[in-house]
């Protein structure tokens, strides 16, 4: 029986270059990480995650995960844009206790510069609330969040969401309806950018 001829395998790993990924201007253009690629065009639309602690050094914000997408490459640096954030599930679970109510109020908001975002606030009550109270609280949170977003630019809104300033505004407004333990914006996602 004839032996099959061995084909020479080309090592594509040697062709790859390393690119430094930078965070957007809003987060200080810090280095998030590095990634290999054969062609800079292959980097576009890649998604990267980083915690707030990695970007700011603030250990108290360890539970906030920021999501970025590479939108341009210049030389060996890839710049990103913010596409959303999420709070870790173990942090959310640690807030919820027996005898409390969890009020979720996801809402689509539009900023004054034309960005559309889906924002997911979570309110936790001190004691169990009636469904009518929860419904009223949900409506109040949604209205207040739409109002806040319409007055801010995209960067101001993202900064407020990530730092917790908007969550504290919502807390002070919603606690008038029912005593609250905590309000947190657990998730956000950019849906549309202005043309």
Swiss-Prot record:
Q: What is this protein called?
A: Small ribosomal subunit protein eS1
Q: Does the keyword Ribosomal protein apply?
A: yes
GO cellular component terms, semicolon-separated: ribonucleoprotein complex; ribosome
InterPro entries from the xrefs? Answer: Ribosomal_eS1, Ribosomal_eS1_arc
Give one Pfam family, short name only. Ribosomal_S3Ae
GO MF: structural constituent of ribosome
What is the scientific name of the source organism?
A: Methanothermobacter thermautotrophicus (strain ATCC 29096 / DSM 1053 / JCM 10044 / NBRC 100330 / Delta H) (Methanobacterium thermoautotrophicum)
* Entry similarity comment: Belongs to the eukaryotic ribosomal protein eS1 family.
Record SMART domains: Ribosomal_S3Ae (SM01397)
Source superkingdom: Archaea
Q: Which UniProt keywords apply?
A: Ribonucleoprotein, Ribosomal protein
From the UniProt record, give one GO term of the biological process aspect. translation
**HAMAP family assigned to the protein according to its UniProt record, in alphabetical order:** Ribosomal_eS1
């Amino acid at each position: 029986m004839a032996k099959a001829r061995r084909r020479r395998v080309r090592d594509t790993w040697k062709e790859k270059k390393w690119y430094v990924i930078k965070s957007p201007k809003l987060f200080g253009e810090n280095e998030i990480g590095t990634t290999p690629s054969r062609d800079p065009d292959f980097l576009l639309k890649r998604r990267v995650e980083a915690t707030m602690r990695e970007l700011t050094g603030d250990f108290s914000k360890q539970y906030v995960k920021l999501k970025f997408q590479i939108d341009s490459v210049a030389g060996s640096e890839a710049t990103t844009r913010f596409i959303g954030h999420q709070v870790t599930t173990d942090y959310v679970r640690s807030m919820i206790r027996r005898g409390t109510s969890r009020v979720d109020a996801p809402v689509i908001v539009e900023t004054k510069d034309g960005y559309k975002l889906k924002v997911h606030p979570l309110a936790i009550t001190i004691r169990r609330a009636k469904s009518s109270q929860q419904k009223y609280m949900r409506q109040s949170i949604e209205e207040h969040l739409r109002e806040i977003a319409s007055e801010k630019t995209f960067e101001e809104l993202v900064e407020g969401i990530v730092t917790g300033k908007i969550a504290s505004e919502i807390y002070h407004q919603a606690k008038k309806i029912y005593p609250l333990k905590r309000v947190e914006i657990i998730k956000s996602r950019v849906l549309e950018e202005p043309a």
